[in-house]
């Protein structure tokens, strides 16, 4: 019989462990309040975050970096209006068959659908531009969902989206 040992860590740590497992070392975009908790641990994890002047630039740079190096990168934007700036680069990456991790922070689960601060229907926005998309609904599944999204991007040779409500961060989970 196999015994599975669980380790407690924060959802941010679990997210970064999955990025490391897949060799993602570069992220591009703008980090807003909905993604802020994770940015502090990128440097120690060997992940370089390249802050850009506009989300569109981040998406285009991520696409170019991935195509030039053959290494998947990540693009992230602030929820709502910031996410809309990723439309052109993500569709471009889709047409270029670029495997790209698209991270879209979102309003909190409890306020979604109520017209909260900078709320946009982010899943609908990208549904025709990604090979796969999934939203995290349970903090204990952040690593599982992220792993699946990255794997689908590699297999589909196209961008894949993980939508993460802001209340998924700063949770302690068993991994």
Give the positions of each predicted feature.
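N-terminal alpha/beta PP-like core and its mobile active-site loop of ThDP/TPP-dependent enzymes
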Residues: 6-175
């Amino acid at each position: 019989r196999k015994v599975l040992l669980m380790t407690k860590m924060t959802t941010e740590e679990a997210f970064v462990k999955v990025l490391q497992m897949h060799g993602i070392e570069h992220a591009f975009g703008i980090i807003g309040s909905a993604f802020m908790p994770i940015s502090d641990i990128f440097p120690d994890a060997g992940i370089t975050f390249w802050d850009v002047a506009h989300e569109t630039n981040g998406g285009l740079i991520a696409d170019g970096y991935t195509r030039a190096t053959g290494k998947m990168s990540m693009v992230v934007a602030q929820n709502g209006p910031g996410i809309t700036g990723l439309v052109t680069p993500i569709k471009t990456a889709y047409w270029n068959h670029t495997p790209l991790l698209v991270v879209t922070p979102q309003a909190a689960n409890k306020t979604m659908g109520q017209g909260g601060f900078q709320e946009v229907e982010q899943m609908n926005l990208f549904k025709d531009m990604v090979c796969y998309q999934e939203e995290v609904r349970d903090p204990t599944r952040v690593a599982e969902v992220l792993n699946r999204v990255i794997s689908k991007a590699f297999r589909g040779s196209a961008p894949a989206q993980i939508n993460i409500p802001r209340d998924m961060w700063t949770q302690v989970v068993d991994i």
